Amino acid sequence: MHCPFCGANDTKVIDSRLVAEGEQVRRRRECVACGERFTTFETAELVLPRLIKQDGTRQPFDEEKLRAGMQRALEKRPVSVERLEAALAHIKSRLRATGEREVKSLVVGELVMAELRKLDEVAYIRFASVYRRFQDLDEFREEIDRLAREPAKE
């Protein structure tokens, strides 16, 4: 690593510690050339796969768009921000676990539906009605009946 003081290429690590609940490594470094010490922090860069939209276009995963969609479905529902954030983290974890560089947006939609179903059934129906483009009351009834018949998967 380059020394931020003199620009030399040769630095040595004199101390390493886990910080941020094990999510980061803090390193104390010393420049071999000038002797100055400095601190660096390392975190794993966890890249989420790109999304393949239904029309075939590709776009980067957008966590804010995902959060906004889930918040819209959960509007005025008794679900804490902590539970929403945990659901978002679970969705991102499942996407990373695929090991794929690209996933179809349908995969994300199904993961969102599964998480919303565990959080709040009304929010699940709200999201499903938009996501699956319900056209009439019969489609709502069918989904509600299916919800009543099939237990949510944990």
Swiss-Prot record:
**MF terms in GO:** ATP binding; DNA binding; zinc ion binding
InterPro entries for the chain = ATP-cone_dom, NrdR-like_N, RNR_NrdR-like
Q: Which domain of life is it from?
A: Bacteria
Q: Which cofactors, if any, are listed as required?
A: Zn(2+)
Entry keyword DNA-binding: yes
Q: Which GO annotations describe the biological process of this protein?
A: negative regulation of DNA-templated transcription
Q: Please indicate if the UniProt record lists Nucleotidyltransferase as a keyword.
A: no
Enumerate the spans annotated as ATP-cone domain. 49-139
- Zn finger (unnamed) location: 3-34
According to its UniProt entry, what is the function of this protein?
Answer: Negatively regulates transcription of bacterial ribonucleotide reductase nrd genes and operons by binding to NrdR-boxes.
Name of protein: Transcriptional repressor NrdR
- Provenance organism: Pseudomonas putida (strain W619)
